[in-house]
Amino acid sequence: MQKLHFDVTGMSCAACSARVEKAVKALDGCCNVTVNLLKNDMTLELDDAKLSQDDVVKAVTAAGYGASLRDNDSNPSGKTKTQKKNSQAEVLQQELTATRKRLYWSLFFCALLMVITMLPMVGITFSFFEGAQKAPAFAFTQLLLTLPVLVLNKNFFTRGFKALVGLAPNMDSLVALGATASMLSGIVSLYVMLYAAGAGDWSTVSHHAHNLYFDSAAMILTLIGLGKYFEARAKARTTDAVSQLVSLVPDTARVIRNGEETEVPADEVAVGDVLVVKTGERIAVDGVVIEGRAQVDESALTGESLPVEKAVGSKISAATLMHSGHIHAKATRVGADTTLAQVIALVDEATSSKAPVARLADRISGIFVPVVLAIALVTALVWIAVGADVEFAMTLAVSVLVISCPCALGLATPTAVMVGTGRAARLGILFKSAEALEKCSGISAVILDKTGTVTEGKPIVTDVRVFASHLRERDLLKLAASVEVKSEHPLAQAIVRSARENETGLYEAKDFGQQPGSVFSKINGKNYSIGNRTLAQNNVAILKELETLSEAGKTALVVCEDNVPVGIVACADTIKSDSAEAIRAFKAAGLRVMMLTGDNERTAKAIARAVGIDEVVSEVLPADKAAVVKQTQQQGARVLMIGDGINDAPALATADVGMAIGAGTDVAIECADVVLVNSKLTDAVSAYELSGAVLRNIKQNLFWAFFYNAIGIPVAAGVFFTTLGWSLNPMIGAAAMSMSSVCVVSNALRLRRFKPTSRNSLSSFSTVAAAYAAYQLPLEQRSKTMQKVISIEGMHCPHCSGAVTKALTKLAGVTSVDVSLEKKCAVIECEETVTDDVLKATITDLDFEVTGIETK
């Protein structure tokens, strides 16, 4: 099966997209067909053995629309959207320009028409149109002013009547029928006036002079055009997030070829070329720094505002800005392979898909226009049957036609999805489909892989303990690194890295060897070995320290000199700075949080306590992670799985929503529904919050679209005329129809201002750091509880005390909270590990002042 993208022309409403989708789905050999009204495109999977691309184009053409294979599919030139200036944003801009031009001329002629028809109603008359004898000239002038408006908006008629002939009426059909009915009514009245004038029947002339509908036809088309203009302008803004990324890619790049610095077009840079990037320039392709240092602004890709330092070996990405410095970098990924191109491709893929919540709107869109036509016909017949005059019945029928709006239904979901995924991309969150975007908001449980997700996945030296009087900590670290330098074990590499960072230097080690549980070497004539607790022999002090370090979740290695234990070097996989904050946010949202790890139970629980996780599944094999996810689902939970490694891929695929850390493996990213570019766990919270915001926005849009039609059509049909006297002029109906689509698109645009709560407070990071420092204490110290009285200034109402209570209750280790407004204090029961710094930072985050903390 081949996945293809087609550009579709001629669609104006949800009925159009439903018609195209139905026509293509009927072809044998096509599946997963999705038509996007907002983007005017279609994606599908094609079986080459059964069907050709031309067959798809013919099916769309037969349905009354145009289709062409997108250039990126038909011409694999390697150029990407980042390198093609004829982007979707520019197409939308061209549409906006053309719509604006039509609108301005329509408004001009419509204004002239309104002047001669409306001013006499307020006493401002024109002598050359006064009197029954001049009424035919007055009517003919209205006709002449209306004709340019019809010509300017001829697309409504050509598309609308073509769709009617093809038995697939759409919004254009409704507008065309409404405007045509008004025009025909006016032309009939004009002929009646001419015949009556010839017969000298001036009363008939006067009567029909006040029942011309030329102004209605012109106003219907102009107001619909006005709505289309606002809609086109809003559509152009929905792609801002991605189009801004596209615009950041420079047109040229400087490369070194044949020993000389040369400027070439960015799309001619090849893998292996050496780039030269200076301060203030944007990087054209992905690469790795081979010379120099720099500060790079990566906010375009990651959403992070602070520049990132780059040195030799650091990776750089296309579209990022060189804040300061000068580097040479080797191009590693160009064209469609760059990170930026992949981000845009993922966003494009997501916006081309459909959210499950849109299915009801799709089903209704397929029958909406025929039902409206039937309602308009029934409206006219019923009113004529009950004795109303033909003109009144026709007015109501035209109102029904022009007020009905399938556009709002068709735009409700894709606009919210497009703006939401674009905003997510700016925050460094990539949703692969609209379904993932919707499902993410419905999760009830979060399962986290430990290594690389909660922790950095890179061990560091945390403790150096010396048990020999002739050694210092620095000496012990130097000895340990000198022995471990030839080992490939991650802990050995952490020790060597720590020695180099502390500039201890290394001894010359000889006769390196290893055996189960330890490694050994000879340094300065002495035998040194490093390994597990078996090397501690029966040294009580060392065994006790090993126990303490183990309870803190650290892996301790014993260092021996001539078979005598002289010290301990402990390593640990450090917790990410934002892990505790993210987990607190998930729990505050009412989600169940679990952690999976292959580590032993003691280490796993130590890490879990440090970040506030209550449920831990330790010593789990990679193959069993998916089973844990499935078991959680069987308990009724909708699971979000977050991981980064190859061994997480089955679990990511099994979960309701799989979320991959961006720094993870390609396999994990491939299996995931969502990718976190920044590798930050707080971005998972942002994804959850944004998903909820998008789903709420879609539901608001759908409600408005359904509510508008449910109220507007009966009012236009005159249902309330006999009881309340309510009826709608076709011009008002046309204005309402236009504004309904504008309201839907404008509501979706509010998502551009979405701000995740995890990025609102800078002080929260200091809170996390303080909490992590507290949890490095041994287990037996952590189990003690105490009472603390926190004096607080700034609380004035129950809302204030409630906010303090809620914030303190969320802290790991706090067992009870009692806040008194009268005494201006909070009394808490907590474990000894909850430090004053943590408490103060938590309350300060709420904009209250802590004046004192007393421990009892």
Where are these regions (language model features)?
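Membrane-embedded alpha-helical bundles of multi-pass transporters
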Residues: 122-136, 165, 184, 423, ...
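Conserved ATP-binding TGD loop and adjacent catalytic N/P-domain core of P-type ATPases
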Residues: 2, 18, 525, 553-555, ...
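P-type ATPase nucleotide-binding
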Residues: 461, 465-589, 601, 613-629
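Hydrophobic alpha-helical transmembrane segments
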Residues: 144-156, 163-166, 180, 203, ...
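Actuator/coupling domain of P-type ATPases
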Residues: 64-70, 78-81, 85-87, 140-142, ...
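Conserved cytosolic catalytic loops of P-type ATPases
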Residues: 31-46, 54, 211-214, 243-337, ...
